[in-house]
């Protein structure tokens, strides 16, 4: 396990050394990884840190307002780039291609933000499992294998690249960060795009965003999963009232894990699963069916794409 206090001192010193008298951009997402990086970088660089949150249109319900509130002391740049992301993802169905497109779009948006500001470095919250999955060919993470090979930044700084998620949480507690951040569930960098099987559209994202909100409301506080989510699969036949319908299929997933390298499904009570199914199909009229995924990792990954 990591010595959190020693790590904090070393990370701050390393950021100072690498950036020197220059400036750096920190990519905020609201998750524990980027939040820890943001605090470390802010302590190292102060006003020479440019915090940026990109609203991709692929985020969780209420996420942008939450970011504004939590990081208001940093006065972050909030960029609505949703049109750019949806346009770039139009017609794309391959999961790996989606991840690479999202990674490239993030970099291009960051480059636009810092034009004329003489910012040489990008700081991001890559952690060890991200590197393992990307380098091992399992899936490209938007902040590793999904990054373009050519960028305007002179260097990318990844203070957490050798830490597992549970170690990042230890650092978060030592900083200290509020529990709502230090204990927050992982959320994929490419956002809800990897919870939509096939082409990403605004309609599909709206459906899966509401479904994810319901799943989190029903599971997070009571059962404390490592991660829980809803993914949109395809359409299937259902019945609404006395009429046949052709609606979306939503897959619910909740897992237990320590480091995200392996995971097992949570054995949730039937009444909880029934409530989730009932809420999703009644509150989202375009959904016809809800299923629960019990596949461990391996052979499955935690996310669907």
Swiss-Prot record:
One GO MF term attached to the UniProt entry: GMP synthase activity
Catalytic EC class: ligase
Domain of life where this protein originates: Archaea
Binding site for ATP: 29-35
GO cellular component assignments: cytosol
CDD domains hit by this protein: GMP_synthase_C
SUPFAM superfamilies cross-referenced by the UniProt entry: Adenine nucleotide alpha hydrolases-like, GMP synthetase C-terminal dimerisation domain
Pathway: Purine metabolism; GMP biosynthesis; GMP from XMP (L-Gln route): step 1/1
InterPro entries (alphabetical): GMP_synth_C, GMP_synthase_B, GMPS_ATP_PPase_dom, Rossmann-like_a/b/a_fold
Catalytic reactions of this protein: XMP + L-glutamine + ATP + H2O = GMP + L-glutamate + AMP + diphosphate + 2 H(+)
Alphabetic keyword roster: ATP-binding, GMP biosynthesis, Ligase, Nucleotide-binding, Purine biosynthesis
TM ranges: none
Domain GMPS ATP-PPase per the UniProt entry, residue ranges: 2-184
Pfam families with a match to the protein in the record: GMP_synt_C (PF00958)
EC number of the protein: 6.3.5.2
SUBUNIT field: Heterodimer composed of a glutamine amidotransferase subunit (A) and a GMP-binding subunit (B).
Role this protein plays: Catalyzes the synthesis of GMP from XMP.
PANTHER family: GMP SYNTHASE [GLUTAMINE-HYDROLYZING], GMP SYNTHASE-RELATED
Designated name of the protein: GMP synthase [glutamine-hydrolyzing] subunit B
Organism: Methanocella arvoryzae (strain DSM 22066 / NBRC 105507 / MRE50)
